[in-house]
């Protein structure tokens, strides 16, 4: 075999070695390198989510405030957030007012919670040494002023329902005395009246219904939530000379003698 041919055959494997090494796969990226490469993509997605949420929030807040969206088409992000905060504060104030009107104990719970938080702040400021004395004094004074304002708040006024006395065994309804309905020289005895509704329409007088009685007198009707709406009516006669009315089903001869125990009197 010629010598030059042997050199060509011997050199061919060595020449093919660099080509085979160039086809080897790259090393896997580390976690830090992967985060660096995906950070721009994640930032782009985050901004897209923020912009989409702000767009929906803008539509909702403009609808809630009854404002024309065409006039507020170029609202800044800060304006949208400020309008949302103000709207939520107004809603919270309305809900607090409604809760106080329906459940007066809410105000007591609020006072107790505020007092507890104030005590915790006072305890922290008294034990912390890094707080400036002026700042501590102003903060405690502000909290004390707020506490005084909360304590000065009154419960919402609700219509007072006259208290009912103990029911007499012979009657199905308790005897009620009306206080402050109309000036009169003597206390007005109250009788339970069993029967249908009054013939003429009732008139509202001082929060009570003024209904003419069949005997020509006038009666103030007191609604009692403890009894059904279509049940018996408890009239309070303005004339103290009107006697105690008996139910139609009970005759005076069968009825036992009614003494002063059946009618409440202050004497």
Swiss-Prot record:
PANTHER family: BASIC HELIX-LOOP-HELIX TRANSCRIPTION FACTOR, HES-RELATED. It comes from the Eukaryota. CDD domains: bHLH-O_HES1_4. The lineage of its organism: Eukaryota, Metazoa, Chordata, Craniata, Vertebrata. Transcription repression requires formation of a complex with a corepressor protein of the Groucho/TLE family. Interacts with the bHLH protein hes2, and binds DNA in the form of a heterodimer with the bHLH protein hey1/hrt1. Interacts with the bHLH protein hes6; this interaction may inhibit the transcriptional repressor activity. One of its GO terms (biological process) is negative regulation of DNA-templated transcription. This is Transcription factor HES-1. The gene is hes1. Residues 1-45 are annotated as: Disordered. It is found in: Nucleus. It comes from Xenopus tropicalis. The keyword DNA-binding applies.
